[in-house]
Design a protein with these regions (language model features):
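Class I S-adenosyl-L-methionine
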Residues: 1-30, 34, 104, 118-138, ...
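Class I S-adenosyl-L-methionine-dependent methyltransferase module
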Residues: 27-123, 127-128
Protein backbone atom coordinates (compact mmCIF):
# COMPACT_ATOMS: atom_id res chain seq x y z
CA UNK A 1 0.00 0.00 0.00
CA UNK A 2 1.68 3.21 -1.15
CA UNK A 3 1.19 6.48 0.74
CA UNK A 4 -0.80 9.13 -1.13
CA UNK A 5 0.52 12.64 -1.83
CA UNK A 6 -0.98 13.92 1.43
CA UNK A 7 0.63 11.05 3.39
CA UNK A 8 -2.44 10.31 5.52
CA UNK A 9 -3.84 6.88 6.41
CA UNK A 10 -7.34 6.73 7.91
CA UNK A 11 -8.83 3.61 9.48
CA UNK A 12 -12.59 3.86 9.95
CA UNK A 13 -13.01 0.72 12.12
CA UNK A 14 -9.64 0.29 13.81
CA UNK A 15 -10.61 -2.34 16.41
CA UNK A 16 -7.48 -3.82 17.97
CA UNK A 17 -5.27 -2.12 15.33
CA UNK A 18 -3.77 -5.38 14.05
CA UNK A 19 -3.55 -3.93 10.53
CA UNK A 20 -2.99 -0.33 11.51
CA UNK A 21 0.11 -1.20 13.55
CA UNK A 22 1.79 -2.57 10.41
CA UNK A 23 1.12 0.44 8.18
CA UNK A 24 4.29 2.25 7.11
CA UNK A 25 5.27 5.27 5.05
CA UNK A 26 2.58 7.70 6.21
CA UNK A 27 3.22 10.99 7.97
CA UNK A 28 -0.14 10.82 9.76
CA UNK A 29 -2.27 7.89 10.92
CA UNK A 30 -5.85 8.37 12.10
CA UNK A 31 -7.51 5.42 13.86
CA UNK A 32 -11.24 5.61 14.48
CA UNK A 33 -13.69 3.31 16.20
CA UNK A 34 -17.16 4.00 17.56
CA UNK A 35 -16.53 1.92 20.70
CA UNK A 36 -15.61 4.51 23.31
CA UNK A 37 -14.08 2.07 25.79
CA UNK A 38 -11.85 0.62 23.10
CA UNK A 39 -10.63 4.08 22.12
CA UNK A 40 -10.16 4.99 25.80
CA UNK A 41 -7.94 1.91 26.17
CA UNK A 42 -5.87 2.74 23.08
CA UNK A 43 -5.49 6.37 24.10
CA UNK A 44 -4.60 5.30 27.63
CA UNK A 45 -1.88 2.87 26.54
CA UNK A 46 -0.54 5.47 24.14
CA UNK A 47 -0.26 7.86 27.09
CA UNK A 48 1.48 5.36 29.38
CA UNK A 49 -1.48 3.74 31.14
CA UNK A 50 -0.28 0.69 33.10
CA UNK A 51 -2.33 -2.37 32.24
CA UNK A 52 -2.73 -5.19 34.80
CA UNK A 53 -0.98 -8.53 34.39
CA UNK A 54 -3.82 -10.41 36.07
CA UNK A 55 -7.57 -9.93 36.26
CA UNK A 56 -9.60 -12.27 38.45
CA UNK A 57 -13.07 -13.43 37.50
CA UNK A 58 -14.49 -11.37 40.37
CA UNK A 59 -12.68 -8.28 39.06
CA UNK A 60 -13.94 -9.06 35.57
CA UNK A 61 -17.54 -9.12 36.79
CA UNK A 62 -17.09 -5.93 38.83
CA UNK A 63 -15.60 -4.00 35.91
CA UNK A 64 -18.39 -5.24 33.64
CA UNK A 65 -20.92 -3.68 36.02
CA UNK A 66 -18.92 -0.47 36.63
CA UNK A 67 -17.65 0.38 33.18
CA UNK A 68 -17.26 4.12 33.68
CA UNK A 69 -15.08 3.88 36.79
CA UNK A 70 -12.03 3.47 34.55
CA UNK A 71 -12.87 3.45 30.81
CA UNK A 72 -9.35 2.46 29.73
CA UNK A 73 -9.32 -0.53 32.07
CA UNK A 74 -12.84 -1.43 31.00
CA UNK A 75 -11.75 -1.49 27.37
CA UNK A 76 -8.85 -3.78 28.19
CA UNK A 77 -10.84 -6.17 30.36
CA UNK A 78 -13.92 -6.15 28.13
CA UNK A 79 -11.93 -7.28 25.12
CA UNK A 80 -8.59 -8.59 26.33
CA UNK A 81 -9.93 -10.78 29.14
CA UNK A 82 -12.98 -12.14 27.30
CA UNK A 83 -13.27 -15.34 25.30
CA UNK A 84 -12.43 -14.76 21.67
CA UNK A 85 -11.96 -11.04 22.28
CA UNK A 86 -15.74 -10.56 22.23
CA UNK A 87 -16.88 -7.58 24.28
CA UNK A 88 -17.54 -9.01 27.77
CA UNK A 89 -18.31 -12.32 26.09
CA UNK A 90 -17.28 -14.42 29.07
CA UNK A 91 -14.22 -14.59 31.31
CA UNK A 92 -11.34 -16.18 29.39
CA UNK A 93 -9.07 -18.78 30.97
CA UNK A 94 -5.95 -20.53 29.80
CA UNK A 95 -6.61 -24.16 28.92
CA UNK A 96 -3.94 -25.38 31.31
CA UNK A 97 -4.47 -23.05 34.26
CA UNK A 98 -7.04 -20.90 36.02
CA UNK A 99 -5.41 -17.60 35.13
CA UNK A 100 -6.99 -14.90 33.00
CA UNK A 101 -5.79 -13.88 29.58
CA UNK A 102 -4.66 -10.50 30.91
CA UNK A 103 -0.89 -11.05 30.66
CA UNK A 104 -1.02 -12.31 27.09
CA UNK A 105 -3.45 -9.61 26.00
CA UNK A 106 -1.28 -6.95 27.62
CA UNK A 107 1.82 -8.19 25.81
CA UNK A 108 0.04 -8.25 22.46
CA UNK A 109 -1.46 -4.79 22.94
CA UNK A 110 1.85 -3.23 23.94
CA UNK A 111 3.52 -4.76 20.89
CA UNK A 112 0.75 -3.36 18.69
CA UNK A 113 0.93 0.10 20.22
CA UNK A 114 4.72 0.26 19.90
CA UNK A 115 4.32 1.42 16.29
CA UNK A 116 1.36 3.73 16.93
CA UNK A 117 2.89 6.22 19.32
CA UNK A 118 2.02 9.16 17.07
CA UNK A 119 -1.33 7.89 15.80
CA UNK A 120 -4.50 9.90 16.40
CA UNK A 121 -7.26 7.87 18.06
CA UNK A 122 -10.79 9.20 17.69
CA UNK A 123 -14.26 7.88 18.54
CA UNK A 124 -16.87 8.57 15.86
CA UNK A 125 -19.36 6.94 13.58
CA UNK A 126 -17.40 6.01 10.45
CA UNK A 127 -19.33 8.57 8.40
CA UNK A 128 -18.34 11.39 10.76
CA UNK A 129 -14.58 10.86 10.60
CA UNK A 130 -12.79 13.93 9.17
CA UNK A 131 -10.82 12.66 6.17
CA UNK A 132 -8.04 14.84 4.70
CA UNK A 133 -8.19 15.17 0.93
CA UNK A 134 -6.33 12.43 -0.93
CA UNK A 135 -6.02 10.08 2.04
CA UNK A 136 -5.76 6.32 1.96
CA UNK A 137 -8.84 4.93 3.72
CA UNK A 138 -9.04 1.45 5.22
CA UNK A 139 -12.36 0.02 6.37
CA UNK A 140 -12.82 -3.28 8.20
CA UNK A 141 -16.53 -3.18 9.09
CA UNK A 142 -18.58 -5.82 10.92
CA UNK A 143 -19.34 -8.64 8.51
CA UNK A 144 -22.64 -8.54 6.66
CA UNK A 145 -25.53 -9.99 8.69
CA UNK A 146 -23.52 -9.91 11.92
CA UNK A 147 -23.98 -7.61 14.89
CA UNK A 148 -21.60 -4.92 16.10
CA UNK A 149 -20.40 -4.18 19.62
CA UNK A 150 -23.78 -3.10 20.91
CA UNK A 151 -25.88 -5.63 19.03
CA UNK A 152 -26.69 -3.25 16.19
CA UNK A 153 -26.27 -4.25 12.55
CA UNK A 154 -24.34 -2.20 10.03
CA UNK A 155 -26.44 -0.89 7.15
CA UNK A 156 -24.32 -2.48 4.43
CA UNK A 157 -25.99 -0.68 1.53
CA UNK A 158 -25.33 2.65 3.19
CA UNK A 159 -21.76 1.59 3.97
CA UNK A 160 -20.91 0.71 0.39
CA UNK A 161 -22.55 3.89 -0.88
CA UNK A 162 -20.30 5.89 1.42
CA UNK A 163 -17.21 3.95 0.30
CA UNK A 164 -18.05 4.84 -3.31
CA UNK A 165 -18.48 8.50 -2.36
CA UNK A 166 -15.08 8.57 -0.68
CA UNK A 167 -13.41 6.95 -3.69
CA UNK A 168 -15.16 9.28 -6.13
CA UNK A 169 -14.02 12.36 -4.22
CA UNK A 170 -10.30 11.69 -4.44
CA UNK A 171 -9.52 9.13 -1.74
CA UNK A 172 -7.98 5.68 -2.16
CA UNK A 173 -10.33 3.20 -0.48
CA UNK A 174 -9.61 -0.34 0.71
CA UNK A 175 -12.26 -2.53 2.35
CA UNK A 176 -11.69 -5.78 4.22
CA UNK A 177 -14.75 -8.01 3.78
CA UNK A 178 -15.91 -11.45 2.70
CA UNK A 179 -17.82 -10.11 -0.31
CA UNK A 180 -18.47 -6.79 -2.02
CA UNK A 181 -20.62 -5.20 -4.74
CA UNK A 182 -19.56 -5.73 -8.35
CA UNK A 183 -17.94 -2.30 -8.66
CA UNK A 184 -15.37 -3.23 -6.01
CA UNK A 185 -12.55 -5.52 -7.11
CA UNK A 186 -10.73 -8.06 -4.95
CA UNK A 187 -6.97 -7.43 -4.85
CA UNK A 188 -6.01 -9.92 -2.11
CA UNK A 189 -7.52 -12.89 -0.30
CA UNK A 190 -6.59 -15.45 2.36
CA UNK A 191 -8.44 -18.32 4.13
CA UNK A 192 -8.76 -17.71 7.88
CA UNK A 193 -10.07 -19.93 10.66
CA UNK A 194 -12.94 -18.65 12.78
CA UNK A 195 -14.83 -19.86 15.82
CA UNK A 196 -18.36 -19.23 17.05
CA UNK A 197 -17.72 -20.36 20.63
CA UNK A 198 -15.42 -22.45 22.83
CA UNK A 199 -16.37 -25.68 21.04
CA UNK A 200 -13.50 -26.70 18.75
CA UNK A 201 -15.94 -28.52 16.47
CA UNK A 202 -17.60 -25.19 15.66
CA UNK A 203 -14.49 -23.75 14.05
CA UNK A 204 -14.67 -23.05 10.33
CA UNK A 205 -12.73 -21.39 7.53
CA UNK A 206 -13.76 -18.35 5.54
CA UNK A 207 -11.91 -16.29 2.95
CA UNK A 208 -10.93 -12.80 4.04
CA UNK A 209 -10.65 -10.44 1.06
CA UNK A 210 -9.39 -6.93 0.41
CA UNK A 211 -11.38 -4.85 -2.06
CA UNK A 212 -10.84 -1.51 -3.71
CA UNK A 213 -13.23 0.60 -5.75
CA UNK A 214 -13.02 0.33 -9.53
CA UNK A 215 -13.58 3.85 -10.83
CA UNK A 216 -15.79 3.86 -13.95
CA UNK A 217 -13.89 4.37 -17.20
CA UNK A 218 -15.02 6.91 -19.73
Amino acid sequence: MLPPPCGVFVSLFCGSCAVESKVQGFSRIICNDKHRYLIAMLQGVQGGYELPDTVSEAEYRYIREHKDDDPALTGFVGFGCSFGGKWFGGYARDRHSDRSYAAGSKKTLLQTMATLGDAEFICNDYRAVPVPQGAVIYADPPYRNTTGYGGEKLDTDEFWTYMRLLAQTGHTVFVSELEAPDDFVCIWEKPVQRSLDRNVSNRFFSTEKLFTYALPTE
